[in-house]
Amino acid sequence: MTNIRKTHPLMKILNDTFIDLPTPSNISSWWNFGSLLGLCLIMQILTGLFLAMHYTPDTSTAFSSVAHICRDVNYGWFIRYLHANGASMFFICLYAHIGRGLYYGSYMSQETWNIGVLLLLAVMATAFVGYVLPWGQMSFWGATVITNLLSAIPYIGTTLVEWIWGGFSVDKATLTRFFAFHFILPFIITALAAVHLLFLHETESNNPTGIPSNMDMIPFHPYYTIKDILGALFLILALLTLTLFTPDLLGDPDNYTPANPLSTPAHIKPEWYFLFAYAILRSIPNKLGGVLALLLSILILVFIPMLQTSKQRSMMFRPFSQLLFWTLIADLLTLTWIGGQPVEHPYIIVGQLASILYFFLILVLMPTVSLIENKLLKW
């Protein structure tokens, strides 16, 4: 008798996705982050659902409702900090996943890669609107500053900003719609993730060598299910350590002050995972130029497959490209640090140099060095 998992219409899909899926035998732990992102998404949706049961999206009660969750709801503090630090874990996994894709040439599966970029944008949008919900000082001013960037769009900018605000400033209407967006977006992300997986399984997984592995596949279960469970245990350990010992380590103290439109915080800055893009935005003195650079810093990922000049897919056997890749990582860490610093000397010039280097590495140096490597290998 044929196993039910291979005949039942629903079980068959799950079987082909997580059990009998042919997987390259040599994929490393860098391939764990996809499943960890799925775990993060499920966890964020569940903790978010329980938070939404007690939260009120109204300017007069939002801040106190979050305090009520932390003080009066059973394990409310735990759910709230799991959700806040879960977002940080989500972005750590997301950036590692993208870094893996860049290093090993996974972007050559273009449909999967482009859906991935869409997913990144959706997660960033979700995190941004979610940060506004506690209605602290940084929530309010972060929302004001970032939405105001749209006013740089010629002709329709101001109208667009007021349309998003639902008035002439960030107020009750803004908070209510941001809560609605924050609630719906994770479900859109879930649907996109399913499409991401669908495209991935059309082309098969890449592997560290970048060479097709059709002749050497193993079933996903039990080999990679056990490997993913180990990764999940590490993720949960890190998240629980962060949540139970230093829950406010990655947050901003200003967000413990209720939103006040009459008092501006000394340094307005987003959460740590947006600081690199914020640094690029600030490094250009012109408003429209800054907004375009900010957009391009993320959307440049779409152009990565077109910039592939190497005849090898992976960087595994390309030491010069590896050097540039790690220079790019160092540059992104520098930008993250600069984004959290005040706008003064020497941070301004360091930020500008790091921003120029970011685009120069991706658009010029990496494709050029790939061509040189081809020549060295007489290709």
From Swiss-Prot:
Cellular component, GO annotation: mitochondrial inner membrane; respiratory chain complex III
Residues that, per the record, bind a ubiquinone: H201
Textual note on the cofactor: Binds 2 heme b groups non-covalently.
Superkingdom, natural source: Eukaryota
Membrane topology classification: Multi-pass membrane protein
Sequence positions that bind heme b b562: H83, H182
Assembly and interaction partners: The cytochrome bc1 complex contains 11 subunits: 3 respiratory subunits (MT-CYB, CYC1 and UQCRFS1), 2 core proteins (UQCRC1 and UQCRC2) and 6 low-molecular weight proteins (UQCRH/QCR6, UQCRB/QCR7, UQCRQ/QCR8, UQCR10/QCR9, UQCR11/QCR10 and a cleavage product of UQCRFS1). This cytochrome bc1 complex then forms a dimer.
Cited function: Component of the ubiquinol-cytochrome c reductase complex (complex III or cytochrome b-c1 complex) that is part of the mitochondrial respiratory chain. The b-c1 complex mediates electron transfer from ubiquinol to cytochrome c. Contributes to the generation of a proton gradient across the mitochondrial membrane that is then used for ATP synthesis.
Binding site for heme b b566: H97, H196
Cross-referenced CDD domains: cytochrome_b_C, Cytochrome_b_N
Recorded GO MF terms: metal ion binding; ubiquinol-cytochrome-c reductase activity
Gene source species: Sagmatias obscurus
Disulfide linkage: none
GO biological process, one term: mitochondrial electron transport, ubiquinol to cytochrome c
Note: Heme 1 (or BL or b562) is low-potential and absorbs at about 562 nm, and heme 2 (or BH or b566) is high-potential and absorbs at about 566 nm.
Obligatory cofactor(s): heme b
Locations listed in the record: Mitochondrion inner membrane
Alphabetical keyword list: Electron transport, Heme, Iron, Membrane, Metal-binding, Mitochondrion, Mitochondrion inner membrane, Respiratory chain, Transmembrane, Transmembrane helix, Transport, Ubiquinone
Assigned protein family: Belongs to the cytochrome b family.
Cited InterPro entries: Cyt_b/b6_C (IPR005798), Cyt_b/b6_C_sf (IPR036150), Cyt_b/b6_N (IPR005797), Cytb/b6-like_sf (IPR027387), Cytochrome_b (IPR030689), Cytochrome_b_C_euk/bac (IPR048260), Cytochrome_b_N_euk/bac (IPR048259), Di-haem_cyt_TM (IPR016174)
Transmembrane region(s): 33-53, 77-98, 113-133, 178-198, 226-246, 288-308, 320-340, 347-367
Annotated protein name in UniProt: Cytochrome b
Pfam families: Cytochrom_B_C, Cytochrome_B
PANTHER family assigned to the protein according to its UniProt record, in alphabetical order: CYTOCHROME B
